[in-house]
UniProtKB/Swiss-Prot annotation:
Keyword tags: ATP-binding, Chloroplast, Fatty acid biosynthesis, Fatty acid metabolism, Lipid biosynthesis, Lipid metabolism, Metal-binding, Nucleotide-binding, Plastid, Transferase, Zinc, Zinc-finger
Gene3D superfamilies: 2-enoyl-CoA Hydratase, Chain A, domain 1
Cofactor note (record): Binds 1 zinc ion per subunit.
Subcellular compartments: Plastid, Chloroplast stroma
Gene: accD
EC number: 2.1.3.15
Domain CoA carboxyltransferase N-terminal positions: 231-498
Assigned GO CC terms: acetyl-CoA carboxylase complex; chloroplast stroma
Region described as Disordered: 36-59
PROSITE patterns: COA_CT_NTER
Organism listed in the record: Morus indica (Mulberry)
GO biological process: fatty acid biosynthetic process; malonyl-CoA biosynthetic process
Protein name: Acetyl-coenzyme A carboxylase carboxyl transferase subunit beta, chloroplastic
Pfam families the record matches: Carboxyl_trans
Purpose of the protein: Component of the acetyl coenzyme A carboxylase (ACC) complex. Biotin carboxylase (BC) catalyzes the carboxylation of biotin on its carrier protein (BCCP) and then the CO(2) group is transferred by the transcarboxylase to acetyl-CoA to form malonyl-CoA.
């Protein structure tokens, strides 16, 4: 049977509240034991049978019940005093304070001032003289040999507690009872003893200087995380880490939960358009700060320049023509990374020109929406883009009878939702996309009403008839190709169909 040992606590799958030191101060194999389940443990079982060192090797060090799950450890880890008793019924007070790194042991009967005396008498006991230390699988030389001082041992105890406190927000505190022993050991124990294996393979010390070195090294984990954070993308849904190099090949879909993460406009163009067929339009069109918007934090022009350097784009939308499985299409893709995909005068003008070009060339149109709405730095000029784009779409759809598909990604809000985002002949949404006109916080502050959770998510809105299908990214290109062919748009070369 495997025994988890950590000074004043024993671990065997779940945390056991009723224990003091892992080994008795006065006799081998007899743990100082706390037999109470209250917040302030007291001694209430004077006849508790505790296995001695003469028991078989398969016996457990602990003869206690599983009283408190690991998730309740926060209740007694910070600053507590335990009243415990060894097999000789000698009472001890064990006090520890994590914040101040205090660990004290007092004997209630004889008021021993130096705990080292107890260890000295223990090491010279008759048991140690009669029984071979190396033959006893429960003998831990790192704790009881004289060259390892009591101070180092206590420092190890406090260090392990502190290391646990740092990791206390991990999954170990969830409501699940299916705890993995190794997982608990990793975060709490710092050392392990297995009574069925030899000493050379089963004893791991936490009492020497290497444990303190490990603690110091762990303090640099945050710096290491910051150094390599650019290599990983964290999922917004499950908070799992996805390796950035592989994420693009997986269409920016989380490998842990399948959540559709945000994609750049360039990645979406690469996903939908056949290689070598992309022809961009109006790439040199940039905003000139038409209303001379003043900001205390950063001038509008400087902010535009910073996003241009950051994304490599000139504005929050890319427009152009290309082929989708051999079918010529006009496509505009908004990029949320550029000022939240906000729609200003340049964005509206580029989309309007794209629609007019598709009208003249009789091309099917795709607009991929990812926007926070109208750009406030351009005032009413940004608001008028809603009407301008809608007017161009009216001519495209009603007069020319051409086919327009709107793809709503996360997030699609504000003026984009109120204009061309909802004007498609077919409106497609990505799974779990956030789609709304006004955000949850704006609605709650304006109407003083609570917005239900999930009421602005694609799956909920689908049942309300807000759009047509919800299509994941994997089959999206094939779905678009079938829709175009259904509406009499065919590839120029039949052999180019993939």
């Amino acid at each position: 049977m495997e025994k988890w040992r950590f000074d004043s606590m024993l671990f065997s799958g779940v945390l056991e509240y009723r224990c003091g030191l892992s080994k008795s101060i006065n006799s081998l194999g007899d743990p100082i034991e706390n037999t109470s389940v209250n917040e302030d443990p007291i001694i209430n079982d004077m006849d508790k049978d505790i296995p001695s060192g003469s028991d078989s090797d398969n016996s457990s060090y602990s003869n206690v019940d599983h009283l408190v799950g690991v998730r309740y450890i926060r209740n007694f880890l910070s600053d507590d005093t335990f009243l415990v008793r060894d097999s000789n019924r000698d009472s001890y007070t064990i006090y520890f304070d994590i914040e101040n790194q205090i660990f004290e042991i007092d004997n209630h009967d004889s008021f021993i001032s130096e705990p080292e005396n107890s260890f000295y008498s223990y090491q010279n006991s008759s048991y140690l003289n009669n029984v071979s230390k190396n033959d006893d699988p429960r003998y831990d030389r790192y704790v009881y040999d004289t060259q390892y001082s009591w101070n180092n041992h206590i420092n190890s105890c406090i260090g392990s507690y502190l290391r646990y406190q740092i990791c206390i927000d991990s999954d170990i505190l969830t409501s699940s009872d299916n705890y993995n022993d190794n997982y608990i050991y990793t975060y709490i124990c710092g050392e392990r003893v297995n009574s069925n294996e030899s000493e050379s393979s089963n004893i791991r010390t936490g009492a020497d200087d290497s444990d303190l070195t490990t603690i110091r090294e762990s303090s640099n984990d945050l710096d290491v995380t910051q150094k390599y954070r650019h290599l990983w993308v964290q999922c917004e849904n499950c908070y799992g880490l996805n390796y950035k190099r592989f994420l693009k090949s997986k269409m920016n879909i989380c490998e842990h939960c399948g959540c559709h993460l945000k994609m750049s406009s360039s990645d979406r163009i690469e996903l939908l358009i056949d290689p070598g067929t992309w022809d961009p339009m109006d790439e040199d069109m940039v905003s000139l700060d038409p209303i001379e918007f003043n900001s205390e934090e950063e001038p509008y022009k400087d902010r535009i320049d910073s996003y241009q350097r950051k994304t490599g784009l000139t504005e929050a939308v890319q427009t152009g023509t290309g082929k989708l499985n051999g079918i010529p299409v006009a496509i505009g893709v908004m990029d949320f990374q550029f000022m939240g995909g906000s729609m200003g005068s340049v964005v509206g003008e580029k989309i309007t020109r794209l629609i007019e070009y598709a009208t003249n060339q009789s091309l099917p149109l795709i607009l991929v929406c990812a926007s926070g709405g109208a750009r406030m730095q351009e005032g009413s000029l940004s608001l008028m883009q809603m009407a301008k784009i809608s007017s161009a779409l009216y001519d495209y759809q009603s007069n020319k009878k051409l086919f327009y598909i709107a793809i709503l990604t996360s997030p699609t809000t504000g003026g984009v939702t109120a204009s061309f985002g909802m004007l498609g002949d077919i409106i497609i949404a990505e799974p779990n996309a956030y789609i709304a006109f006004a955000g949850k916080r704006v609605i709650e502050q304006t109407l003083n009403k609570t917005v239900p959770e999930g009421s602005q998510v694609a799956e909920y809105l689908f049942h309300k008839g807000l759009f047509d299908p919800i299509v994941p990214r994997n089959p999206l290109k094939g779905v678009l190709s079938e829709l175009f062919q259904l509406h009499a748009f065919f590839p120029l070369n039949q052999n180019s169909i993939k």
